[in-house]
From Swiss-Prot:
Signal peptide: none annotated. One of its GO terms (molecular function) is phosphate:acyl-[acyl carrier protein] acyltransferase activity. GO terms for cellular component: cytoplasm. It holds the Pfam family FA_synthesis. This is Phosphate acyltransferase. It catalyses: a fatty acyl-[ACP] + phosphate = an acyl phosphate + holo-[ACP]. GO terms for biological process: fatty acid biosynthetic process; phospholipid biosynthetic process. Homodimer. Probably interacts with PlsY. SUPFAM superfamilies: Isocitrate/Isopropylmalate dehydrogenase-like. Gene3D superfamilies: Isopropylmalate Dehydrogenase. The gene is plsX.
Amino acid sequence: MQQLTIAIDAMGGDFGPQVTVPAVVQALSQFPELKVTVVGDRDAISTQLTHLNYTLNPRFSIVHSDSVIGNNTQPSKALRHSRGSSMRMALDLVASKDVDACISAGNTGALMGLSRFTLKLLPGVERPALISPLPTKNNQRTWMLDLGANVSCDAETLFQFAVMGSELAEQSIGRKAKVALLNIGEEEIKGNDQIKRCAEMLNQCQNIEFIGYIEGDKLYQGIADVVVCDGFVGNVCLKTSEGVAHLFLDQLKSQLLTSKFKQILAKWLFGDVISSLKGLNPDQYNGASLIGLRGIVVKSHGSADISAFNNAIKEAVHEIKRQIPNRISDRLEAVLLERHY
């Protein structure tokens, strides 16, 4: 059995060890081959272990850190003053190959900057990208990138995102991924120069199954396996979608919980429907991967609860098993060779 090792930034996110530590304990029971190094304030971590009645063992180790990078800290400042922080120390463990992956719910900009600094980019990669799956019809998924790592992107960067996103998606779906560019229309004349130029490049690439442009209202139809956009558009789109999903689920819950009779009636009449709607909960898709690096980094939502953070750990486990950085590197090399001939 392959041993899997992960470093956790225990102090990142809105709740710190109150969420990260129970999620780790849960993951250790789910994956017998998993070993976790939890980086953060030793006393705060130990307090949570006491609450859980969990005893330290060789599969759960603590590395003490003296500081935390705040959510409002500028990436440039975080880079200069990161030594001794839980995020930096967790990433250093990946860089030194003491662990296979790192997970943090901390400052996104700081995580991206520190990841680039400590792990470096894969050969040929201009910028890393944040990618995460979205729920679609028939319980399928669509992977979307970039979700906020890069506010603006040129055509070459978008093209690289398409290649990297395809490889990650294909390791889950087991077939060639259908790739689309997010645009304001499906017609060839629509979009800015970067999108049009990227579309030309993708049309010429036999290594990618490019299906053209896709509009925002088609994101959840399962038309494309991978949707590519810059980080500004992707982040706004993702946050809007999550807000609508939470609003819908909260409204549904408030209506069904007004009386015991309504609860029983709803479960009897709409049990399957209610069960399927749980798939819209963004927590099930927590864990955006920062791809394009020489190591595995998974970004959890700062507001993630225990279950959501556990899903981020599951994503890291999947990427370790599938050796995602190596596969992305090989795919990029194959595309580069194709473009030269």
